[in-house]
Regions:
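A detector for small-residue-rich transmembrane helices and their helix-helix packing motifs
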Residues: 1-174
Length: 174
């Protein structure tokens, strides 16, 4: 089982989480590297770094479990290079499109779930047998936390899923 990219991204996320919460001030770290209005003032690195910042231990654990579960399937299918391109480029596009929401809200977007949603969308497109289940999963993950009062970037999940689905539909990486 060669999951070179998936395992590397998981390791990087946990290393950054450790730095964020145990080495640096987590609030300042999150603001500096999360995606927020500072992006419009020149903090352009945020579009990349926000994919590696997480709001809590449960946030990173849930993201990394889902990344491992679906990343292991797609990395085997695509190979690590194409999988890496899908994850990173899909995450960047999701971040850029999510910037539109920042115009209306003062928020700080953090987490890997936008890029992970790209993977789910891609998989839903190429795997017609599991398509309905994956759509249900993304809807639950996007909206159930809101019903419990948990702040979730539901739009990033839906945007990412759509980007991934389109990438699969147009056979961008095959």
């Amino acid at each position: 089982m060669n999951l070179r990219f998936t395992l590397a991204i998981i390791a990087i996320n946990f290393i950054i989480y450790f730095l964020q919460y145990f080495v640096y001030d987590s609030f300042e770290f999150g603001i500096l590297f999360g995606l927020n209005e500072l992006f419009f003032a020149g903090a352009y690195w945020q579009i990349i770094t926000s994919m590696f910042i997480h709001g809590s231990f449960m946030h990173i654990v849930m993201n990394m479990v889902v990344l491992y579960q679906f990343g292991s399937i797609l990395e085997r299918y695509l190979g690590w290079v194409k999988f890496g391109i899908l994850y990173i480029v899909g995450g960047l596009i999701t971040g850029f499109l999510s910037l539109g929401y920042l115009v209306f809200e003062r928020i700080n977007l953090v987490g890997a779930s936008g890029a992970i949603s790209v993977l789910l969308g891609f998989l839903a497109c190429i795997d017609r047998y599991n398509r309905k289940g994956l759509v249900i999963v993304i809807l639950i993950v996007s909206f159930a936390p809101l019903l419990m009062g948990v702040n979730v970037a539901w739009y990033a999940h839906l945007i990412g899923f759509g980007i991934g689905y389109l990438a699969g539909f147009f056979k961008v990486l095959r």
